[in-house]
Amino acid sequence: MKRTFQPSNTSRKRTHGFLVRMATKNGRLVIKRRRAKGRKRLSVSIATK
């Protein structure tokens, strides 16, 4: 049986990325909550060299 988590940076970014969050009202609320909580990472960001 195939495992449920098949990692892919592309789909990860397209679903949970910053621009996707900012596109909707609720997404902006997510960012706002994470800012208030003091999260280091507000959304998924793929580390690049």
Curated annotation (Swiss-Prot):
InterPro entries: Ribosomal_bL34, Ribosomal_bL34_CS. GO terms for molecular function: structural constituent of ribosome. It comes from the Bacteria. GO terms for biological process: translation. The keyword Transferase does not apply. One of its GO terms (cellular component) is ribonucleoprotein complex. Keywords: Ribonucleoprotein, Ribosomal protein. Belongs to the bacterial ribosomal protein bL34 family. HAMAP family: Ribosomal_bL34. This is Large ribosomal subunit protein bL34. It comes from Citrifermentans bemidjiense (strain ATCC BAA-1014 / DSM 16622 / JCM 12645 / Bem) (Geobacter bemidjiensis).
